[in-house]
């Protein structure tokens, strides 16, 4: 059998608790757990772990750099722009139309909202920057939403997501019992 140890990285002695551990099963979500930080710490400690490596985790959490990488290898991605307090709000709406505004390095749709005017874009920016230093406005793409998990070199079957919300937000992901998966 296996001996399992639960370790909370919020505790100051979490690294010391890992002494003698042969494998870490990472069950953390969001910044600090999915962004390469924990993966890097475990790698530094010489402890093998489950899931993606440091670089893959860091890129997956960073929407801006992921999109730049995809563009660099010729993959299609929705148009986007990094927002700052001095952004040309109306110019962005004129260029993209409706956009989704999101923290660049956050998950679970936290801090994410839509905007279809200069005023709502500015408000969405203020909301998103509460959760991350970098904020993106991404062009709205109309159509069904799918998710596909990749395990090793294999893509698992796609899942179509349906929600009564405007988009697959935090509520639809974790709270609502009305979200449908096909």
Q: What kind of feature is each model-predicted range?
A:
Residues 1-55, 59-65, 72, 84-91:
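ATP-binding N-terminal substructure of ATP-dependent carboxylate-amine bond-forming enzymes
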Residues 4, 15-19, 59-144:
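Active-site nucleotide/adenylate-binding loops and adjacent lid/helix of ATP-dependent enzymes
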Residues 30, 109, 164-167:
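Glycine-rich phosphate/pyrophosphate-binding beta-alpha loops
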Residues 35-37, 110-111, 147:
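Short glycine-/acidic-enriched loop or helix-start segments at secondary-structure transitions
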Residues 48-52, 77, 157-158:
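Short hydrophobic/aromatic-enriched beta-strand-loop microsegments
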Residues 116-182:
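Phosphate-binding site of ATP-dependent enzymes
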């Amino acid at each position: 059998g296996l001996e399992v140890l639960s370790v909370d990285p919020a505790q100051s002695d979490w690294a010391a608790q890992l002494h003698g551990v042969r494998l870490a099963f990472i069950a953390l979500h969001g910044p600090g757990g999915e962004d390469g930080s924990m993966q890097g710490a475990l790698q530094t400690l010489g402890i093998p772990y489950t899931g993606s490596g440091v670089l893959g985790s860091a890129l997956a959490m960073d929407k801006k750099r992921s999109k730049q990488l995809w563009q660099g290898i010729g993959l299609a991605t929705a148009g986007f722009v990094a927002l700052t307090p001095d952004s040309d709000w109306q110019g962005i709406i004129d260029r993209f139309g409706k956009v989704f505004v999101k923290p660049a390095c956050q998950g679970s749709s936290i801090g994410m909202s839509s905007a279809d005017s200069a005023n709502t874009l500015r408000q969405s920016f203020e909301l998103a920057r509460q959760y991350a230093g970098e904020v993106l406005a991404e062009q709205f793409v109309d159509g069904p939403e799918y998710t596909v998990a990749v395990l090793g070199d294999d893509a698992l079957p796609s899942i179509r997501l349906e929600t009564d919300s405007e988009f697959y937000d935090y509520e639809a992901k974790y709270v609502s019992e009305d979200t449908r998966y096909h």
